[in-house]
Structures are given as structure tokens and as C-alpha cells.
Swiss-Prot record:
Entry similarity comment: Belongs to the protein kinase superfamily. Ser/Thr protein kinase family.
Cytoplasmic topological intervals: 241-607
Coiled-coil features, chain-numbered ranges: none
Record-given protein name: Probable LRR receptor-like serine/threonine-protein kinase At5g65240
Organism: Arabidopsis thaliana (Mouse-ear cress)
Highest taxon of the lineage: Eukaryota
Length: 607
């Protein structure tokens, strides 16, 4: 009997969650069905058991896949794999803008944890599967701009948590279930649909943001009795319903003749009210300031539901295109989803303000943990510093090589690498340069960044590229090793090297490793690993941008692949440079001596 109970428990645990193998197989099947090229999703390896390290994939702490975001990847007219139904822990599935053909598989109804489904801007055909009605946790459903046909399934009326349904620009026909008009945000335009009910009518501007079906029916009945009564009752119900729903305005899309509504859907991005963030931050009190950078101040906030957030109040935000341009760029940032990137959860815009809302990071930033911890707090140990270096590198690699268009950070430093409750590195402040650079081209001509972290070419030309991020990352590695600031004038008391980079280079040449490493580590580190991190940092901070490695190569070197060869090349080049510098120095000294020895009359020339 005991054996039977144990067996039952084992089987129940197996069925309660999906194994990493099965998750990986399902995702790889999706990659194949989408017809991804060898260059696309190249790290989705069928032989790799754990898909949680794959790009565009996010997992929870139990290694369950919770998010897959593949937006505008330009796949080659693939289809949706029915095997995706295995991913029962999936909460977010975004596949918009990929030219996907065929129908939506029935198995998608097995994704019982799904809260957001975005298949916008593809070539999907056939009917909307009725199995979508099984997704009881679904809040956001976006199927806009496809070729879907047939009627809207009645099963969607059972989705009680749905707050956003966008079905516009398809070939749908028939009646729209009346209960869907109670959803806060909907768009059924550019279809062959009618509003349904006892009195069919097209979905036009008569659809009211604040009325309901019963009030409309009452108005019609009253109209039979008397035309005057219709007007009176109409006014009565209008003001009654307006007052009743004053606290919650529904966002409704309707057809307007000769005009297209340009408002943008943001999936899970939340649009906050200014007053809500003002209250959350205690009127943007200085005591709640977490930090200040080139893009504005960051405030700690507490929402009314108890959620802790970080609110970034942008400066210099005005740019051509106004609110819509800002929103489009905010959406671009929100699409960059990776475990080592700070997730944007919402935004706020007013005539004079632009604010971004992020989750609050429990352990603040790398800079804080290195230099600002309180007495008695644990020191950031060497193992965590290694993990932070690798995590930040992976986040930047994703921005440079997996985002379309790619995102250049422009201010990589220890203060912009945040740490969650598990001390996992989360790169913040990415994508903000485009939001705040006033009337600039795609190549930023205004120097953005922090002294000591800015690459030489950025100072001389004002232009940024992926390689300026690599330089900033290299300086951050030196901060992790030394615990020191990138620029520190107190060093002038003992030496001429104000910049951390020059200071470390000098000590490295003199083989004084013990003087480089952070004294707080108390010699509790592995010497070879410290040397490796310093080598990667110096390769990243070479003066010529073309000689710096790409972030993908940095990741490989930190994982122990290819560093020895690259370091040997750098050392040989450095020897040549030193010899050339000494030769020029001797020539300069000789010339200076010659001038000093000349007669003053010769120097002044003829009179």
C-alpha cells in the first residue's frame, strides 16, 4: 500500500510541472515551425537541456518557462507549432510581426497560466479557436492585423479577467458578443462585424464609453412612448452612467470615417496616472531618491496595492512627434525582455512630465553594494562578483545582438547594474538615450554617460556605438575587482592616476595583483579568476573601438573560451605601443633640450 502511495505521489509530481527537456523540445519545435534562419535564435540548442538560458526566454525560480517574446524577428513565413501547448507555465507569449501563416493551433488553449497573448501583424488565417476560452487567466489578447475569419467565439465571453481585446483589421464577421463591450479596452474595427443583440447595428461612434446594454434598451422602449421622453431619458441615463463610472473610464476603439485611430496598445505595459506616482513617491520627496544619472532622478515608490517600484523622472524629454513618439519608443524598450535586463512595467506622460516605472530592486545597485553598504552588512563576495559580471555581459549582448533595432546603452556603469533579491545582475537605464536626446539623429551627438566610463571616441566625436558600451562595461569590471570608483581624485595624494583604468594598468604592469583587488574581499578570492577578469576588462577598454571585443565574445571569454589567445595578442600589441611611445618620448626630450640650449637671439629671429 505504501508503495502505491509513493508511486502515485511521484507520478503526480511529474504531471504537475513540465520537465526542462519537454520545455526545450517544445520551444525548439516552435523555432523550427517558425522557420528561423541559422542566425536567428542561434542559442536555442536542441541538445541543451535547460531553455532558461536561451535568448527571448524567461523562467521563474523553479526553471519553468514563463515568457517567450519574439517580436518582429522576420521569420520566413512559418507556422505555429501545436507543441506549444506543452508550456503550461507560460504567462506571456508575444509573436507579433513575424509573417506567421496558417491557423492558431487548438492546443494554445492548454496554456492555462497565460495572461498575455500577442499575435498581432502576422498572416494568420482560419477561425479564432474556441479553446482560447480555456485561458481563464488571460488579461491581454491581441490578434490585430491578420487574416482571421469566421465569428468571434462565444467562449471568449467566459474570460472574466480580460481587460484588453484587440481583434481589428481581420476578416471576422457576424455579431460581437455583448459582454465583450464591457471590457475596458477593445478594438473590433476593420472587420465585417455588427454589435449584435436584438437591434443589429455597425460598430460606429454611437458605441458609448460609459453606457450599458440595459440603459440603451430602456431608451429605445421609452422612445416608442414619446419622442420627448427619449430625449429626457437619454440625458438622464447619460449623466447617471457618467457619474456611476466616473472613477473608471473605458478605452474604446470605434470606426471613424476617413480616419484611423493612432493610439497604441502596450500589452502588459501599464499607463500610470501622474497623481498615482506622485502619491507613491510622497510628492517625489528627496528622501525617496535612489539615485541620479544622465537621464534624471530615480525615486523609490510604494503603490496603493503595496507594490514597491522605482520611478524614473526623465529630463530633457521633449522631441518631435510628442506623446506618440515617446510611447512608440517606450514600447520598443518594453519589448527587450531578458533575465538580465530591467523590465519596464509602466509609464506616465503629461504635458510637462515623462516618467518610467520599474520594479524595485531589493539589493539596489552594484555601486551601492561595493561602496555604500552600511557597517555590518555582508560584503559582495567574489562568487557573486563573477556572476554579476557574466549576467551584465549577457544583458548587454542581448541589447546589441538580439534586439531589432539594436539598443545602445550609452551609460554602462556599476550604478546602472542593479541587483535583485538573489543578487542577479539586471542592467537598467537601457534605451533611454533616444527618449531624452532632443532633435537628434539615430547617432547621438550629445555626450551621454558618466566621467571615467565614457569611451575616448565618444568624447572626441560625440558618437556612440556598441563599442562605447563595451568600454563602459570594461570599467565596470574593474570596479567589481577593485571596489573603487572609475574616477577618484583622492589617488592624487599618492600617484598621478585619477582614472581607475590608468591605475589598474600601472599595477598590472608591475604585477601587483594584491594591490588591485578590493581589500574588503580579505584575500578570499581565486587569483586566476581575478587575473582573467582584469584581462577581459583591459581588452574591453582599448583606445581603438574596433579592437574591443563584441559583447558576445566577452561572454565567451568570461566563460573561459578564447581569452588566452586574445590576451596574448593584446600583450604583443601593448609592447609595440610602449616601445613606440618611449621612442617618441626620447625624441621629444631631445628636441626640448636642443631648444633650451639655443641662444636667445637665435630663438627670437632677425630684428
Amino acid at each position: 500500500m505504501a508503495l502505491l502511495i509513493i508511486t502515485a505521489l511521484v507520478f503526480s509530481s511529474l504531471w504537475s510541472s513540465v520537465s526542462p527537456d519537454a520545455q526545450g523540445d517544445a520551444l525548439f519545435a516552435l523555432r523550427s515551425s517558425l522557420r528561423a534562419s541559422p542566425e536567428q535564435l542561434s542559442d536555442w540548442n536542441q541538445n541543451q537541456v535547460d531553455p532558461c538560458t536561451w535568448s527571448q526566454v524567461i523562467c521563474d525560480d523553479k526553471k519553468h518557462v514563463t515568457s517567450v517574446t519574439l517580436s518582429y524577428m522576420n521569420f520566413s513565413s512559418g507556422t505555429l507549432s501545436s507543441g506549444i501547448g506543452i508550456l503550461t507555465t507560460l504567462k506571456t507569449l508575444t509573436l507579433k510581426g513575424n509573417g506567421i501563416m496558417g491557423g492558431i493551433p487548438e492546443s494554445i488553449g492548454n496554456l492555462s497560466s497565460l495572461t498575455s497573448l500577442d499575435l498581432e501583424d502576422n498572416h494568420l488565417t482560419d477561425r479564432i479557436p474556441s479553446t482560447l476560452g480555456n485561458l481563464k487567466n488571460l488579461q491581454f489578447l491581441t490578434l490585430s492585423r491578420n487574416n482571421l475569419n469566421g465569428s468571434i467565439p462565444d467562449s471568449l465571453t467566459g474570460l472574466s479577467k480580460l481587460i484588453n481585446i484587440l481583434l481589428d483589421s481581420n476578416n471576422l464577421s457576424g455579431e460581437i458578443p455583448q459582454s465583450l463591450f464591457k471590457i475596458p479596452k477593445y478594438n473590433f474595427t476593420a472587420n465585417n462585424l455588427s454589435c449584435g443583440g436584438t437591434f443589429p447595428q455597425p460598430c460606429v461612434t454611437e458605441s458609448s464609453p460609459s453606457g450599458d446594454s440595459s440603459s440603451r434598451k430602456t431608451g429605445i422602449i421609452a422612445g416608442v412612448v414619446s419622442g420627448i421622453a427619449v430625449i429626457l431619458l437619454g440625458f438622464f441615463f447619460f449623466f447617471f452612467c457618467k457619474d456611476k463610472h466616473k472613477g473608471y473610464k473605458r478605452d474604446v476603439f470605434v470606426d471613424v470615417a476617413g480616419e484611423v485611430d493612432r493610439r497604441i496598445a502596450f500589452g502588459q505595459l501599464r499607463r500610470f496616472a501622474w497623481r498615482e506616482l506622485q502619491l507613491a513617491t510622497d510628492e517625489f520627496s528627496e528622501k525617496n531618491v535612489l539615485g541620479q544619472g544622465g537621464f534624471g532622478k530615480v525615486y523609490k515608490g510604494l503603490l496603493s496595492d503595496g507594490t514597491k517600484v522605482a520611478v524614473k523622472r526623465l529630463t530633457d524629454f521633449e522631441r518631435p512627434g510628442g506623446d506618440e513618439a515617446f510611447q512608440r519608443e517606450v514600447e520598443m524598450i518594453s519589448v527587450a525582455v531578458h533575465r538580465n535586463l530591467l523590465r519596464l512595467i509602466g509609464f506616465c506622460t503629461t504635458q510637462t512630465e515623462r516618467l518610467l516605472v520599474y520594479p524595485f530592486m531589493q539589493n539596489l545597485s552594484v555601486a551601492y553594494c561595493l561602496r555604500e553598504i552600511k557597517p555590518g552588512d555582508p560584503v559582495l563576495d567574489w562568487f557573486r562578483r563573477k556572476q554579476i559580471a557574466l549576467g551584465a555581459a549577457r544583458g548587454l549582448e542581448y541589447l546589441h545582438e538580439h534586439c531589432n533595432p539594436k539598443i545602445i546603452h550609452r551609460d554602462v556603469k556599476a550604478a546602472n547594474v542593479l541587483l535583485d533579491e538573489d543578487f542577479e545582475a539586471v542592467v537598467g537605464d537601457f534605451g533611454l538615450a533616444k527618449l531624452v536626446d532632443v532633435r537628434r539623429t539615430n547617432v547621438t551627438t550629445q555626450v551621454r554617460g558618466t566621467m571615467g566610463h565614457i569611451a575616448p571616441e565618444c568624447i572626441s566625436t560625440g558618437k556612440s556605438s556598441e563599442k562605447t558600451d563595451v568600454f563602459g562595461y570594461g570599467i565596470m569590471l574593474l570596479e567589481l575587482v577593485t571596489g573603487q570608483r572609475a574616477i577618484d581624485f583622492s589617488r592624487l595624494e599618492e600617484e598621478d592616476d585619477v582614472l581607475l583604468l590608468d591605475h589598474v594598468k600601472k599595477l598590472e604592469r608591475e604585477k601587483r595583483l594584491e594591490d588591485i583587488v578590493d581589500k574588503k574581499l580579505d584575500e578570499d578570492y581565486i587569483k586566476e579568476e581575478v587575473e582573467m577578469m582584469i584581462q577581459v576588462a583591459l581588452l574591453c577598454t582599448q583606445a581603438a573601438p574596433e579592437e574591443r571585443p563584441a559583447m558576445s565574445e566577452v561572454v565567451r571569454m568570461l566563460e573561459g573560451e578564447g581569452l588566452a589567445e586574445r590576451w596574448e595578442e593584446w600583450q604583443n600589441l601593448e609592447v609595440t605601443r610602449q616601445e613606440e611611445f618611449q621612442r617618441l618620448q626620447r625624441r621629444f626630450d631631445w628636441g626640448e633640450d636642443s631648444i633650451n640650449n639655443q641662444d636667445a637671439i637665435e630663438l627670437s629671429g632677425g630684428r
